[in-house]
Amino acid sequence: MKRRTDLDTKSSRKVYKKYEYTEIGSIEEENEASINFYAVVIDACFPYKVDEKKYMCYLKVIDTTHNVKEGDDNFAIVALQSRKFEDLPIIQRCGDIIRVHRAEYNYKDDQHYFKLNMSYSSSWALFSADEEVAPEVIKDEGDDFTYRSYAYSGKQYNFDTQDQKLLKNTRAWNKSYFAKNDVIIDEMYTPLSQARQEEGDFNVVGKVTQIVHRDYYTSDLRVKDTSKATWFLTVSRRKFPRLYEGVIIKIRSVNIDSETERERCLELAPHSNIMTFVPFSRLAKSLDSQISLSPDKVDKELIKKVILTEPVLATTTFGDYSELPLTELSEIFEDVTDKDAVFRARFSILKITPDRVEDYVEEYTPKGAPRSKPVYKVQFLIKDPSTALNDNLYKIYLYSHGDLGKEFFPGVDPSSAQTPSGHSKLRKYASTLMKFNVHIDAVLEKVGGAFFIRDTEMKF
C-alpha cells in the first residue's frame, strides 16, 4: 500500500481507461459485471493475516443511495483480499472516502457485498473527507491534497476530471450527512456498562479520557462512554498513532481481557481497529459534550486499583549481568536453539501461575541431598513492545531450585513464603506485578530452551 504519493496525475503521460461509476443503491441484484464506485467508510477492521498466503480486510461503506438511518443500518460490505499486507488499506477515520475499481458484486440476504482481489485487477484509493489533508499524511509545504489520494493500492493511481466531480460531490453529501445523522447508531456498538454481558467480541464508542505512553511502542488508554463506565486498554502506538486525550473513538472488535487480574480491562485482536471521527460528525460532537474527562464517583475506587500514571519499574537487577543491554523479547524468543545464554529484558506480566500465592512454593530435593527444601516455582506470561503486534504470550519461570531467583520477592524467601505473613506479602507483590503501568526489568537465563529469572529483585 502506498501511504504517501508524489505522483502528479495531471502531468502523467500514460493514457488511462475511463471508468464508469455506479451508485450502490442502483446496482441490480443479478449484476455479474465488475463494479466501480465511490463510497464513505463508516467501519473498518485492521488488515490481518488469515494464513501464509492470504491477508484480509473488511469495510462497511455507504453512499447517497444506500446509507444508515436511525434504526435502519443500510450499508454495504467490502471484503479485500491480498497475498501481501501492504496491499490492503489501513483506515482509521470514520467518514473518509474510498474509491473502488473492479470489484466483484454479490447480493445476499438483503445485503450488498463487494469483493476485491488485490492479486488480480482490483484497486482502491483513499481520500480525505474534507479538502484539508487527512491526518494520516504528513503534509509538506506547498502540497495540495484537495484531489489527491492519501493512500492507494499499487504503484500509482489515475484521477481525471470525472473523478474530481465525483469526489467533490461525495464530500459535499458526506459533510451534510454526518452533520445531520449519528451514522454509527446504537445497534452498532455496546455500552461499556453492558460489556460483561457480551460473550464474544463487540464494538465500543467512547472518549479517551487518559492516555499514557509507556514507551515508543505501547500506550495505555482509559476509555469512558455515555453509560459512565470506564474500561482500560493497552494499544500499539505503531498501529494507532493518532490517539490523544479527549478524542472520540470507535473500537472495532474488542474483548474482555480474561487473562489478567486487572479489573475492567479490554483486549484487541489482530483484526481490531480504532477509528476517530471526521470533524463534522454530529455523533462525535455530542459525545464530546456528554463525556467528561474526569472520572465519575463510581469509577474512582476502580482507578485507584488500576493506576494509570507514568510507567514504573517494579524491579532492579544486580550481579554480573545487571549492566547487560536490554534485548527485546522478539529477539530473545526468536532463537529456537537450545544454546544457553543470559539476557536482560523489560516487559509486562499478563498472567501469573499458580493463581494462588499459597501454591508458589513446592518441595524440591537436590540430587544427593538428605532432605528436601522449599523453592519458588512460579510461571509468568509476558509481553513487551516488540511483540505488541502478535498474539503470542511468552513464558518465563521463577524457579529457585538452584538458588537463582530466591531473592525476587524481598523479605519473603521460600521458607517464610509458607506462613500467613508470607502469603500476605506475596499477594501485595503479585498485585503490583499485574498493575496496568508496571514494567519488569529482569535478567533472564536460558537453560535447555526455557527462561528463568535470576539476579532480579522487586523494589519494595
From Swiss-Prot:
Major localization listed first in the record, in broad terms: nucleus
Gene Ontology biological process terms in this record: regulation of telomere maintenance via telomerase; telomere capping
Record flagged with keyword Nucleus: yes
Pfam families hit by this protein: POT1, TEBP_OB2-like
InterPro entries, per database record: NA-bd_OB-fold, POT1, TEBP-like_OB2, Telomer_end-bd_POT1/Cdc13, Telomere-bd_alpha
CC terms in the record's Gene Ontology section: nuclear telomere cap complex
Subcellular location: Nucleus; Chromosome, Telomere
GO molecular function term, any single one: G-rich strand telomeric DNA binding
Record flagged with keyword Translocase: no
PANTHER family (alphabetical): PROTECTION OF TELOMERES 1 (PTHR14513), PROTECTION OF TELOMERES PROTEIN 1 (PTHR14513:SF0)
Similarity remark: Belongs to the telombin family.
Record function comment: May bind telomeric T4G4 sequences.
Protein name in UniProt: Telomere-binding protein homolog
